[in-house]
Amino acid sequence: MNPGRLPPRLLAAVAFGGAAVLLTGLWFGPVLVRRTDRVGWLLYVGLPGLAAAVSGAVFGRPLAHPRGPANGGRAFLRGAGIALAALFLFAPLYATMVKVTEPGWTSVAGLTILVLEFGGLALGWELVLVGGLAGWGLHRWARRASPPGGA
C-alpha cells in the first residue's frame, strides 16, 4: 500500500482507530462476548475506536506524512498524546450514550469526570503505551513506504 495514494489523515485515523478497537476488544471482549446486547459493544469497543480515529485524523497527519529527519521518539510521544486526546474525546461521548441508553443517569458532566478518572487509572498506561506504539509504527511505516527524498 502506498501512503502517497491515501490521505495522511485517513491513514492516521485507521491506525489509531484500529489500535483502540484492538486494545478495548481484548480488554472488554471476554466479558462482552457473554452478553447479547449490542449497546455494550458500542459503548466499550465502538466509541473508543471512533474517538481514537477522530483524534488520529486530527493530530496524526505528521506521523503518516513525515517530513524532515526521522525521529521515533517524537513519533512515540505524539502517538501517546493522540491516545490521551482520544480519552478526553471518548469520556463525553460515553457519558452521553449512557444517558441516552440507560435511563436514570442525570449528569453527563459528572459521568464524564468519572470516566476520565477511572479510565485514566485503569487503562491510562495501556493507552499511552499502545498509542505511542501506534504512532511510532505509523511513522516508521510511512517513512519506509514514502519515496526517497520525502514529499
Task: For every predicted segment, state its role.
Residues 1-151:
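Juxtamembrane/disordered regions of integral membrane proteins
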